[in-house]
Amino acid sequence: MGKKHKKHKSEWRSYDAGELGSPGDQSQYYVDKPLEKPLKLVLKVGGSEVTELSGSGHDSSFYEDRSDHERERHKEKKKKKKKKSEKEKDKYLDEDERRRRKEEKKRKREKEQCDSEGETEVFESVRKVDIEATDRPVRACRTHPAENESTPLQQLLEYFLRQLQRKDPNGFFAFPVTDQIAPGYFMIIKNPMDFSTMKEKISQNEYKSVTEFKADFKLMCDNAMTYNRPETVYYKLAKKLLHTGFKMMSKQAALLGDEDTTTEEPTPEIIMPTAAEVVKKSKKPSKDMFRVMEEDQSSIFEPEGNACSLTDSTAEEHVLALVEHAADEARDKINRYLPNCRIGYLKKNADGTLIYTVVNGDPENEEEDTHLVDLSSLSSKLLPSFTTLGFKEDRRHKVTFLNSTGTALSLQNNTLFTNLKPDQIDLMYAGYGDDTGIQCALSLQEFVKDCGSFAKRMVNDLLDQITGGDHSRTIYQMAGSEREGSSNSVLDYMALKTYSDVSLDMSMLSSLDKVKKELEHEDSHLNLDDASKLLPDFHDVHNDRGGSRPSSSSSVSNNSERDHHLGSPSRISVGEQQDIHDPYEFLQSPETENQN
């Protein structure tokens, strides 16, 4: 305890004896007088001192000095009491609060020294408010944001980065990897990544979405798992960091505000007793002791399993985080290359309605973007007041019968297959399909025409497999139509040679064949000789008729006997014709017709 403050007597009571009356009336004549010595003035003039005493002290200046002195003493008492109470309060404050209060006191002391003594209390309060207002930071204008102000995306990514760095207490991924730390690292890893590079990209606002940040984080962990072996610490930490990071940055954790701010506790160091200590404790170590030591060492140095095994409870969350990351990457890629497209799939409800679900919809929309699919959505709306559509038959492209002998198709087929009838051509088209199929079948048969029966049978089997058995049916039907046509014609004696095994005399057929061949040969020679003789005659008649111009077109000379001889039907024997007309009957003059 300090020294107790001594109380001061504020005043002394005195009176003048000459002015007082009786002792009973003296109480009203007490006068308050200060207990002070009179002022002494010492003047030095030329080395001599002159002392002068002041008067009785009843001047007006004395009372003014007295009031100022009492006011100052009163202030000092208040300050002392305030300091004492503040010291008692400071006992229960922490260091930061004490430091802050000391700075405030120092600042106030400096301000009071700068202020003049004649300022009023009101002015001082206003002055204090103004000074305190200047200590506050100047607010930036809202219309012109500061250049270094971070965007909400940057703040979110910085928060993610801080949380991820807490998961790496040893700082393995804090800075870029060099060849001195990991020899041959850049020969294996082509795209290195670390936390410092990610922080620079955040500060430069290079990340346009959280998906790009997650892609760089996954690249960093994949690089560590690619370069290091599974039993190393770096591989295990990278796999664990990948799992926890994706779980933290998942959409559900971001929406629910799942903040994992707890720092990982360092694993306690396990100190195994050395073999020497064991021997000291037991001079004769048994086999059980060695077995226990081996089991303990194997449990310590045994490599950890996968961070996300099939039996792990966090496996589903890890897979969900990876799936969400892949979905976000696919959505960003679609929006980047096809910004206005809507990709989805069709789904049928229980009531039978068909719904189209959009995959790359708005990610902020929690509900699925679905559309009902019906005929009105697939086709345009019909105009009102039109219930039926008009129909007009087009007669310009009317289909006619294709099997008639006068059509263009039958004429074309006759030019391609001159030795076949229209019915046979139809059978071939029905069996082989088109012209290409018919030509292919004929080409194969022509190729094995001079071969044996085995090759022909192989070709027929091949055509049957190609046409599905239509080849054999076509040949059978064509052979049947030929047999029907031959039954109506003259008997073919040469076909009877196949019945030689029957008890019939076939010697006469060979002689008939020889006679028929000789007759056909002689007839062909005679026809050629006659035609060669008639050609010069036709040439002479043509010259006679075309050499001289007739006098008038109305009169034409009569036909001569030579003309009738050359134009007779017996001379025109080029093929078999049923109706042959005399060409000269159309060239008679009109005079002869009038005479008749």
From Swiss-Prot:
Q: Which SUPFAM superfamilies match?
A: Bromodomain
Q: Which UniProt keywords apply?
A: Bromodomain, Chromatin regulator, Nucleus, Transcription, Transcription regulation
Q: Where is the composition biased (Basic residues)?
A: 1-10, 74-84, 99-109
- BP terms from Gene Ontology: chromatin organization
Gene Ontology molecular function, alphabetical: lysine-acetylated histone binding
Q: Site annotated as Histone H4K5ac H4K8ac and histone H4K5bu H4K8bu binding: where? A: 181, 234
Region of interest (Disordered), ranges: 1-31, 49-119, 537-596
Please list the residue ranges annotated as the Bromo domain.
148-252
Q: Which residues fall in a compositionally biased region of kind Basic and acidic residues?
A: 61-73, 85-98, 537-547
One GO CC term, this protein: nucleus
Q: Which PANTHER family match?
A: BROMODOMAIN CONTAINING PROTEIN (PTHR22881), BROMODOMAIN-CONTAINING PROTEIN 9 (PTHR22881:SF4)
Q: What is known of its domains?
A: The Bromo domain mediates interaction with histones that have acetylated lysine residues at specific positions. Also recognizes and binds histones that are butyrylated.
Recorded protein name is Bromodomain-containing protein 9
